[in-house]
């Protein structure tokens, strides 16, 4: 119950067609007809519709169970997958696009792992290739004064909340459902930190938006879709 992959599947809002279509449109445009590498491919929420758009997709994922669910879907057998840690795993060939969506960068729970992820991506990108990350802006401003817990969902069936350690940038997602409790660790990250990680990997910021429909990223944005380019 407590794995990141299980909770990913339970987050039904990310499967809304509008959200998926906007992200797929954004990625297909950046791919320019080349190959795409998805880090944390999971069950193919993005990879399958992107492949149907004519973009060859290869994925990396640590969860064999998630990949099995991808394989069971129409078109899933046509997508190559490497089983491994997407922060360090290497695959054959180069790509015009690599992407990491739905806050998955935060599943890497140390700064070292996130830096390694950027370097791994840079090693796979062709010159001019792009790396895309979709991630929420840390919600610290929503915390009540003096508190470190932020509720997300409260109902008779389920309670979901996050706790933050501002000294370490550690974050935990907490879920209580049907009498069971689970918790998942994350490491929250700011956009400026991601820009520095990209710089360390030899990439530079190309564009940053509030979402896939290219709304401007502003001080009140709750997420960002950022693109870094390999020279």
Segments predicted by a language model, with ranges:
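A short acidic, Gly/Pro-enriched loop at the edge of an enzyme's catalytic core
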Residues: 90-97
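A conserved beta-strand element that flanks and buttresses the S-adenosyl-L-methionine
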Residues: 99-101
């Amino acid at each position: 119950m407590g794995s990141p992959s299980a909770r990913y599947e339970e987050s039904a809002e990310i499967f809304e067609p509008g959200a998926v279509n906007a992200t797929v449109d954004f990625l297909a445009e950046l791919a320019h007809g080349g190959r795409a590498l998805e880090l944390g491919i999971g069950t193919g929420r993005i990879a399958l519709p992107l492949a149907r758009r004519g973009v060859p997709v290869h994925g990396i994922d640590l969860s064999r169970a998630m990949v099995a669910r991808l394989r069971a879907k129409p078109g899933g057998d046509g997508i190559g997958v490497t089983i491994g840690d997407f922060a360090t795993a290497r695959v054959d060939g180069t790509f015009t696009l690599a992407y990491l969506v739905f806050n998955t960068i935060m599943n890497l729970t140390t700064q070292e792992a996130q830096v390694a992820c950027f370097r791994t991506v840079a090693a796979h990108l062709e010159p001019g290739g792009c790396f895309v990350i979709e991630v929420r802006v840390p919600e610290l401003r929503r915390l009540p004064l003096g508190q470190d817990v932020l509720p997300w969902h409260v109902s008779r069936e389920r309670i979901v909340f996050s706790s933050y350690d501002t000294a370490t940038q550690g974050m935990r997602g907490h879920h209580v459902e049907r009498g069971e409790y689970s918790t998942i660790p994350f490491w929250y990250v700011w956009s400026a930190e991601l820009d520095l990680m990209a710089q360390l990997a030899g990439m530079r910021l190309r564009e940053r938006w509030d979402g896939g429909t290219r709304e401007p990223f502003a001080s009140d944005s709750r997420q960002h879709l950022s693109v870094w380019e390999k020279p």
